[in-house]
């Protein structure tokens, strides 16, 4: 991509190989060896998409900034589920989607956060007419608009924006603090039900037991994860997520999901797996269910 075009090096941290990082969580100790004065940009997820591990925003951002680099956070699996407080934690740039805990549906517009302190020095790689100072000048030279408008590209979907407005109005009314608290309680409930019902059925917990180290979903491992996910949809009316090679993601959407639904969902998982009903499903090579 961009790194190749500009002759830059893209370095990927291996946090997925067993033993490299607990629950795939990136810590300052893991990140530090990769940092030097020639690093320009570091990008990490607030919540690891597969395991549900929560990275510490402030400590990692502070570490990156000490080396003179920018820190870009992907908050797709965090926004609408946990408190992030970008200003307090000194975040430079963040991006994310709105179709997860943003409750706005597939295809809804993504979002970009750029701290006011760095808006003037950063440029957009795609110079669209929405980021042009004079939108209708259509001249030969691009002049970036001041402020956050200088980072827009083109017309967003109005229908998608309407969904976002409705969904985020509800999030604001409910208060992200209360939503984050419910996510912590809901995931704790899931872990307790895993201990009580699922551990003896061949499942393993792939997410931290510490509520400060997870978000709104947990991940369970099972050798037959792919077939179990399909069977849960077809036979039990439970909608999980499968991620290769053997992970099942289970989330509480704090706004609409009740604790009773969490209990019932895990009871259905227990019953389906203990009865081996999932064996009716032929093996699938689907990477996502």
Give a label for each model feature.
Residues 1-289:
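Pyridoxal 5′-phosphate
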